[in-house]
Amino acid sequence: MVNMKASMFLTFAGLVLLFVVCYASESEEKEFPKEMLSSIFAVDKDFKQEERDCAGYMRECKEKLCCSGYVCSSRWKWCVLPAPWRR
């Protein structure tokens, strides 16, 4: 009886240890792509988004006019693609 309890305990402890080791290695693998992508797409601190005189697709068109190829939706006040029912 004692040997069976000890073997079950050791088996359970081994499974827990295996789980912890696998989880640790998996979390390290998940961090690697994040670090790689952040270094590839690193943005310069001085980089600023260029201001446009017109609003692009799905942007508000209350104060700005829509860029060429888009029309201002009268219902939603967004710049959308022109369609026959929007003319």
Swiss-Prot record:
Record's keyword annotation contains Disulfide bond: yes
Signal sequence, start to end: 1-24
Main subcellular location of this protein, as a coarse class: secreted
KW Secreted (keyword) present: yes
InterPro entries in the cross-refs: Huwentoxin-1, Huwentoxin_CS1
Localization (cell): Secreted
Tissue: Expressed by the venom gland.
Disulfide bonds: 54-67, 61-72, 66-79
Keywords carried by this UniProt record: Disulfide bond, Ion channel impairing toxin, Knottin, Secreted, Signal, Toxin
PROSITE patterns: HWTX_1
GO CC terms: extracellular region
Family: Belongs to the neurotoxin 10 (Hwtx-1) family. 51 (Hntx-8) subfamily. Hntx-8 sub-subfamily.
Domain notes: The presence of a 'disulfide through disulfide knot' structurally defines this protein as a knottin.
Name of the protein in its database record: U3-theraphotoxin-Hhn1a 12
Organism: Cyriopagopus hainanus
